A protein has these predicted regions:
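Phosphate-binding P-loop
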Residues: 10-13, 73
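The conserved Walker
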Residues: 22-23
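Conserved glycine(s) of the Walker
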Residues: 26
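Conserved substrate/cofactor phosphate-moiety recognition/catalytic segment
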Residues: 29-78
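Glycine-rich phosphate-binding loop used to anchor ATP phosphates in small-molecule kinases
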Residues: 62-100
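Conserved phosphate-donor/acceptor-positioning beta-strand/loop module used by diverse small-molecule
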Residues: 100-115
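Conserved GTP-binding G-domain of TRAFAC-class P-loop NTPases and closely related GTPase folds
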Residues: 116-224, 282, 286
Length: 308
């Protein structure tokens, strides 16, 4: 194959710019400083914030619809910008396999800045998701750099020092691993009156279903004030009731409760591991050395060259 043909094929390849990073890192802030307005933009927020969307105020369905939109664009070989956590490298590899040139702009911020920024947003994801995503994304820096053959820029977002006090406190707590971080966050939540998630909607039941449910749980020892426990039982009961016209009975309800609690315990173990990993990463000089900051102007220059 002639060199000119190779050059033409490369120029005709569709381009994907990935804005990577977890919730509260400032991806939108950086994107607004890059000259990418001519490219189609894929963002789960479009679906989550639209009252007419089936994913309105539902994070996971919003992400699923955004992923579906991105895959449809790939089928048409359309160049676009994708706002995503990038916590799953297989999804990025999918576009490489479809013939895309990919450039990743990874927005990094300290975990407590991400946590506090998320808490100030109108739409807040659970704290466990903030920290697990933080760990998962930034643990992939080397992998992405290799996969994309150096087409990776990192923007270290310090928010102008606004959160320096909290960064120092968090780092001190992190010296005691997950336990230290958990204690710090508990106190921080009380002090700042934050925590929780805006995606926690009450489970919708008809009046009759609700009456039948409360009759069915009279002998079930569960925590009605525990959102996830209450929702899990209501969903299980309602699905069964709508299908069979009656409740599942005490034994099955108790089994569902036990299953939910076991899953919650596993989630707590995973969350503790994520916090331990974060503590290790913060004090790991090899990890810190990977955070090679580029300014918005420097990133834009590299991205424009990539797109040309």
């Amino acid at each position: 194959m002639k060199l000119t043909q190779l050059i033409l094929e490369k120029r005709n390849k569709p381009k994907l710019v990935v804005m990577a990073g977890g919730s509260g890192t400032g991806k939108s802030y950086l994107l607004n400083q890059l000259d990418l307005g001519s490219l189609h933009q894929v963002n789960p927020d479009k679906y989550v914030e639209d009252p007419n969307s089936p994913a309105y105020n539902k994070l996971s369905p919003g992400v699923a619809l955004a992923n579906k939109e991105a895959e449809a664009l790939a089928d048409d070989k359309t160049s676009f910008v994708w706002d995503t956590t990038a916590s799953n490298p297989d999804k990025i590899k999918l576009f490489l396999n479809k013939g895309y040139d990919v450039y990743m702009v990874m927005v990094y911020t300290h975990p407590v800045i991400a946590y506090l920024s998320n808490a100030k947003r109108k739409r807040q994801i659970p704290a466990t998701a903030v920290f697990s995503t933080w760990r998962n994304v930034y643990d992939l820096i080397d992998k992405y750099n290799k996969m994309l053959k150096g087409n990776l820029s990192i923007f270290v977002n310090t928010r102008g020092g606004e959160f320096d006090k909290y960064v120092k406190e968090f780092n001190t707590a992190a010296k005691n691993g997950a336990a230290g971080i958990s204690d710090y966050l508990e106190n921080l939540n009380k002090k700042e009156k934050i925590g929780g998630s805006s995606f926690r909607d009450p489970y919708k039941m008809s009046d009759q279903e609700e009456q039948e449910f409360y009759n069915a749980v009279k002998n079930i020892d569960y925590d009605v004030n525990d959102y996830s426990e209450d929702r899990a039982l209501k969903k299980y009961f309602t699905d069964w009731y709508r299908k069979k016209g009656e409740g599942p009975g005490d034994d099955k309800m108790k089994q569902r409760l036990a299953s939910h609690r076991s899953g919650k315990e596993r989630d707590q173990v995973r969350h503790k591991q994520a916090l331990d990993d974060i503590a290790d990463m913060l004090f790991d000089p090899l990890f810190q050395a990977k955070l090679l900051h580029s300014t918005p102007a420097e990133i834009d220059k590299k991205v424009q060259k990539f797109l040309s």
